[in-house]
From Swiss-Prot:
Gene Ontology cellular component annotations, sorted alphabetically: membrane
Keyword annotations of the record: Membrane, Transmembrane, Transmembrane helix
Protein name: Uncharacterized protein TP_0093
Principal localisation: membrane
Organism name: Treponema pallidum (strain Nichols)
């Protein structure tokens, strides 16, 4: 009575190993042994499955289910970051606080935009448009007790000049000059002279010279 080959012999037979004589003998044995034929069929199915299976890395073994359970348990015992803490408004445990924080941030952004819009639309006074009247002490030679007008000529402006196209042209003139004293003779005295800045629109400047007189 012939004995059946062992598992190592059948594995070598399925893998194509062994001499031609051994393979012919094992093939003849399979024709009359149902048990060995079933084992060889299982070996061939396992070999085909392993051959067509994807490569498995060591990480797949370390990330197995028992390892994941242990890792999750260890992570639950560790302190959480501030954005994942239950007391943090950004965590899922505080949806009301998260909504309140979002409303506050949105309100701050809207207020900032409104203030920026108001500041940008506020009219800014241009240099020379605000009138001022400083008192400048001056020493002049004139008959005391005599008031005279001050005649000031502006710069020559042609009709095609760019000055006429500006929104406003500003001329600094001496609008008022008053001499004080009691001696009718000519003397050197310090008198106050009031200077004013008068904004003049461009449509008024239709002459080559601007003359201003004060009483």
């Amino acid at each position: 009575m012939r004995t059946c080959p062992d598992c190592a012999a059948w594995c070598a037979y399925v893998d194509g190993e062994g001499s031609q004589l051994q393979r012919r003998e094992m093939c003849a044995h399979l024709q009359g042994c149902t048990h060995c034929a079933t084992c060889v069929a299982h070996y061939r199915a396992m070999r085909s499955l392993v051959k067509h299976a994807d490569r498995v890395s060591s990480r797949d073994f370390t990330m197995a289910f028992p390892y994941l359970r242990v890792r999750h348990r260890v992570a639950s015992c560790m302190p959480r970051p501030w954005w994942q803490a239950r007391s943090s408004p950004l965590s899922a445990a505080g949806p009301v606080r998260a909504a309140a924080l979002a409303v506050a941030v949105a309100s701050l952004c809207v207020c900032t935009l409104l203030l920026t819009h108001i500041v940008e639309r506020r009219p800014v006074s241009r240099a020379g448009e605000a009138s001022f009247t400083p008192i400048v002490p001056m020493r002049v030679r004139a008959p005391v007790g005599y008031a005279r007008g001050v005649k000031v000529f502006g710069p020559a402006v042609s009709a095609n000049s760019n000055v006429l196209r500006k929104p406003a042209a500003v001329f600094t003139v001496c609008a008022f000059a008053q001499l004080y004293g009691s001696d009718p003779a000519y003397e050197m005295e310090t008198v106050p002279v009031r200077l004013s800045v008068i904004p003049v629109p461009s449509y008024v400047l239709n002459a080559s010279k601007a003359q201003f007189f004060s009483p």
